[in-house]
Amino acid sequence: NAPAKQCGRIRMVRISDIHENLVTWTTVPFCDIDELDISTYLLQPNDILFARTGGTVGKSFLVRDVPYEAIYAGYLIRTRYSALLCPQYLKYFMESPLYWQQLKTGTTATAQPNCNGQTLSNMLLPLPPAKEQYRIVEKINRAFAKVK
């Protein structure tokens, strides 16, 4: 939860830096972070970020590449998965009605909607074998390409 700065070494991705599943990395602010904490919060390709509070609660972002050393802001949740789960398959799930229905059920209703890692870990996720996940992703990608 470090404050954003204009210059520095480590960038800090906020939910407001993500637009249409893209990050404009050159405008992501910097932050101060203890050197010992960097590896704990450092973003890697295939990480998925979730907004855990506010009007964008549940919004997710699949990190495809990380051209700069960057961490994620404190009001985001980061997940990493094993080789058993295709990151893009999970991202598509997080855009589905099943995901949003489960999120709504598990979201705390306060002045600012709120969810946490426990809410996400309790969700039911249809999980076919990895090979089938990649086939599903490819099929969805082809369908989206036709629409564009």
Language-model-detected regions and their locations in the chain:
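Sequence-specific dsDNA recognition surfaces
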Residues: 1-2, 16-45
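Extended boundary segments
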Residues: 1-12
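Short Ser/Thr-interspersed hydrophobic loop/turn segments at strand-loop and sheet-helix junctions
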Residues: 11-21, 42-59, 72, 76, ...
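A structural connector/turn signal
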Residues: 37-38, 66, 110
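Short beta-strand-centered aromatic/proline hotspots
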Residues: 61-65
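A short glycine-rich beta-alpha junction/loop motif
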Residues: 69-77, 85-88, 108-127
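Short amphipathic alpha-helical coupling segments at ligand-binding clamshell hinges
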Residues: 86-93, 132, 139
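Amphipathic alpha-helical coiled-coil/heptad-repeat segments
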Residues: 101-102, 119-148
